[in-house]
Amino acid sequence: MNPDIKICGLKTPEAMDRALERGATHVGFIFFEKSPRYIEPDLAGKLAERARGKAKIVAVTVNPTNDDLDEIISLVRPDILQLHGNESPERVLTIKAVYNLPVMKAMSVRDADDLKRVEAYIGIADRFLFDAKPPAGSELPGGNGVSFDWSLMSWLDDRVDYMLSGGVNKDNFAQALASTRATGIDLSSGVESAPGVKDPKKIDEFFDAVAEACLPEPAAGS
């Protein structure tokens, strides 16, 4: 099965079109103002129309209020809400009930204890995204270009459908997929020339690597 590929933090028509042309299954807009990948909802709404019907549109939020979500959903009309903050299971349930959209819950990982928090969200979140915990001093919950120990993912069973993020790029994506049960990967800094600047050439290089790769089967027991 081919993995889902999400290009996150898109801000320009050029990067959006290249991601779509090369086969991105998901495209993400970041609505966290401290991020260099932040985009105003009205601009995101215009870019989203280029992707509608071609890839899943993902709205990435961090501890959003209902007012935040009202604006984003009205202007962008996303297919999926990604919650990348400290949203509780109860808050995730409320968001799903109010907005009737699938939720991808992002979880920051440094060690096995971090993964144990997943249990509380199983059956609530529709999918998970596992990212590395931010380095000390970083204000960004994701997109830091930092990886974590993917062998930790062996703790998870097939109740957990997830994407991998955190420092994924053209050089390590095959290893990430082969050593875990991940059904998709999420790229942001891995296809940038500078923070927040998606590079169509790097997008090409990544998808060229995907096309050339012979992805091994997932590791036994992972």
Curated annotation (Swiss-Prot):
EC class (word): isomerase
EC number of this enzyme: 5.3.1.24
UniProt keyword list: Amino-acid biosynthesis, Aromatic amino acid biosynthesis, Isomerase, Tryptophan biosynthesis
Record's catalysed reaction(s): N-(5-phospho-beta-D-ribosyl)anthranilate = 1-(2-carboxyphenylamino)-1-deoxy-D-ribulose 5-phosphate
Record-linked InterPro entries: Aldolase_TIM, PRAI_dom, RibuloseP-bd_barrel, TrpF_fam
Pathways involved: Amino-acid biosynthesis; L-tryptophan biosynthesis; L-tryptophan from chorismate: step 3/5
GO biological process: L-tryptophan biosynthetic process
Pfam families: PRAI (PF00697)
Xref: HAMAP family: PRAI
Name by which UniProt lists this protein: N-(5'-phosphoribosyl)anthranilate isomerase
The species this protein was found in: Rhizobium rhizogenes (strain K84 / ATCC BAA-868) (Agrobacterium radiobacter)
